[in-house]
Amino acid sequence: MMKEIPGPPTEAQIEDGRLLFAGECEFFFGSQKIDQLPPVGRPEVAFAGRSNVGKSSIINALTGRRALARASSEPGRTKQLNFFNLADRLSLVDMPGYGFAKAAKSVKEDWQDMMFAYLRGRTTLERVILLLDARIELKASDKDVMELLDRAAVVFQIVLTKCDQVKPKALAAKIAEVEALALKHAAAYPRIIATSSETGFGIEDLRAEIARFAVPLQTSGEGQSGS
């Protein structure tokens, strides 16, 4: 059965996203091993992408903070899951970048094992935002991660980055290409979001999408720890 591609967010959903991301957002936990994860609590939305895809820039643009998620000086250097508390209503999880060519095979395998264990076993994980660079062709590592997400049975949504650097006709073609690819993956949410952390294009749309998973305001203080 063909997936139906959802429409853009409503004005009310955009406002929900604005309110959520206007709240405080603070780093509260970093984990290099799967047995060091923080206790489950708030719903989680994780961000995945190749090294240099602009993941840190997107997280900073979403939260309106310049240095919340710091980009590593060497692609793929930071191999840990970083957890951020967003307004006590949602946790944002910055996953280590993948596709780092200089890394040893054993390092890549360790990354995949840790990511699969996190994805498969994290009951509070609501969605993975998979970031792809709109300027370049999909890499084998991107397709590998999509297959990993399918196997882990975790819903993922493709978000294109650096779209301000792509001409409109080429961007439309890229969106169509990625939409077709998403329809082939069981775990893929079929709606693609095009963004630019530089211009803010698509950021309110992505905020609205993520806000769907946050604890509702009236119950945000119930059963949640401060971390």
Swiss-Prot record:
GTP binds at residues 49-56, 76-80, 94-97, 161-164, 195-197. The keyword Magnesium applies. Mg(2+) binds at S56, T78. Residues 41-216 form the EngB-type G domain. Keywords: Cell cycle, Cell division, GTP-binding, Magnesium, Metal-binding, Nucleotide-binding, Septation. One of its GO terms (molecular function) is GTP binding. InterPro entries: G_ENGB_dom (IPR030393), GTP-bd (IPR006073), GTP-bd_ribosome_bio_YsxC (IPR019987), P-loop_NTPase (IPR027417). NCBIfam families: GTPase_YsxC (TIGR03598). This is Probable GTP-binding protein EngB. The gene is engB.
